[in-house]
């Protein structure tokens, strides 16, 4: 399966990378969680309550973050669903997370929740340059 980021190109990739660069680590965490939950829930999508439970935050905290993401144009107004731009940004972050998880497990020897947590943090906080290198490393392996 090709990485989701390779499907983007030119101006679209610039917009998505800028979107990823403009989000905080917390916002990125919500985007990745929403993408994962949308994949699991299908068309219905997650509820605000299920998102809060998934992220282990209070309902008011989740509601406030969803408001912020809506203002940024990353989450739909009427549902707890990503917009097309939000989906693209979440796909980039998710691809980074998979690459970072491979590094955590294969290179650093971390396992389980520790590896997942560190990979999500690295994916969310990576600059566009580091994000591209993470994805390239996963696709092609380390360079000499």
Where do the language-model regions lie?
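Amphipathic alpha-helical dimerization/coiled-coil segments
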Residues: 99-140
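A short, conserved structural fragment
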Residues: 70-80
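Short amphipathic alpha-helical interaction segments
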Residues: 53-71
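Helix-turn-helix DNA-binding elements, focusing on the entry/boundary residues of the two helices
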Residues: 48, 66, 101
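Basic, amphipathic "hinge/linker" alpha-helix immediately C-terminal to the N-terminal HTH DNA-binding motif
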Residues: 78-97
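Short alpha-helical segments that sit at the start of domains
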Residues: 2-31, 94
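N-terminal helix-turn-helix DNA-binding core of bacterial DNA-binding proteins
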Residues: 17-57
């Amino acid at each position: 399966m090709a990485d989701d980021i390779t499907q983007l190109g030119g101006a679209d990739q610039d917009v998505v990378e800028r979107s990823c660069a403009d989000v905080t680590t917390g916002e990125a965490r919500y985007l990745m969680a929403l993408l994962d939950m949308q994949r699991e829930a299908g068309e219905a999508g997650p509820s605000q309550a299920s998102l809060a439970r998934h992220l282990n935050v209070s309902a008011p905290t989740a509601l406030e973050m969803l408001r912020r993401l809506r203002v940024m144009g990353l989450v739909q107004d009427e549902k707890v669903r990503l917009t097309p731009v939000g989906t693209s940004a979440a796909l980039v972050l998710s691809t980074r997370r998979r690459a970072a998880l491979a590094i955590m497990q294969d290179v650093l020897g971390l396992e389980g929740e520790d590896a997942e947590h560190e990979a999500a943090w690295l994916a969310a906080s990576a600059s566009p340059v580091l994000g591209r290198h993470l994805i390239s490393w996963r696709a092609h392996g380390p360079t000499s």
